[in-house]
């Protein structure tokens, strides 16, 4: 298995949170998990977001990896990898139904 490092947890909300940032590709407002004491990222989807199913309905756990393809081998693809500026991210579903985000950062981060 590809080496993984915990990055953050993503939680769905319908409430506006402070310091939200807009992600046009997925039409979602997100908070910066790096500024949360427990690395929680809040996601607030717009009604017309193209994101459907488990990614939009369930919390997710995100891991850093150097290779999304190797890390996600054998997993169901929920959202194909895309560029969010600072990283390439993709969403997958584990055998037991957990939503997993794999992230390949473009630069080293703490």
Regions found by a protein language model. Give the residues of each.
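Vicinal oxygen chelate
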Residues: 1-35, 40-53, 76-110
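Short amphipathic alpha-helices within nucleic acid-binding modules
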Residues: 68-74
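Short active-site oxyanion
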Residues: 58-60
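Short hydrophobic/aromatic beta-strand micro-patches
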Residues: 10-12, 62-66
């Amino acid at each position: 298995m590809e080496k993984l490092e915990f990055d953050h947890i993503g939680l769905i909300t319908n409430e506006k949170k402070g310091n939200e940032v807009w992600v046009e590709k997925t039409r979602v407002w997100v908070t910066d998990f790096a500024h949360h004491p427990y690395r929680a990222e809040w996601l607030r989807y717009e009604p017309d977001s193209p994101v459907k199913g488990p990614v939009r309905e369930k919390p997710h756990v995100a891991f850093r990896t150097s290779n999304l393809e190797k890390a996600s081998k054998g997993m169901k693809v929920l959202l194909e990898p895309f560029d969010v500026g600072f990283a390439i991210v993709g969403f997958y579903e584990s055998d037991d139904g957990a939503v997993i985000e794999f992230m390949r950062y473009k630069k080293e981060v703490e």
